[in-house]
Amino acid sequence: MKKLLSMLLCAVMTVTCIGAVPAHAANSDTRLRVGLTISGASAFAAPQLENVSGCKTGYTVGTVSGTAFSGSKSITSSALTVKLVNDAFQVSDTDSGSVLYTSAAGADHIAIRPNSTLTWFKGYKWHGDFVYRRASNGSITVINYVGVEDYVKGVLPYEIDPD
């Protein structure tokens, strides 16, 4: 009898310990890093961002530490191009070509936070911040830092058949 009771108690404790975490316990501030390009052939020489028509325009340029954004300059342009010039990231207005921001020489990345909720990049609308990093071949890789809820809202329409 003791043996049966001990086994039952162990089973109950095991099931209780491995129970699933409730959905409300998940951190809604979780940010994902989505590689929009990778080093090598798919990296860019001059990647571009553009505000979605009808949304707020402008951007804030800065850096990231982990997934925390730290802005240093506001830009009012609606379309930006990022290049590596003289060992520094250079942000310019896509339409006029005027230089709007230049990072410190040797900086390994810059981050751009759009003022709008959606931004065009490579023919798709994206939520979140964009981080530009140096690729080993001298070009630029782009990473989208996006909240998990915005990511799921953006991905599901492409992943689920409407029928």
Where do the protein language model's features map onto the residues?
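Conserved, single-site charged/polar hotspot
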Residues: 2-163
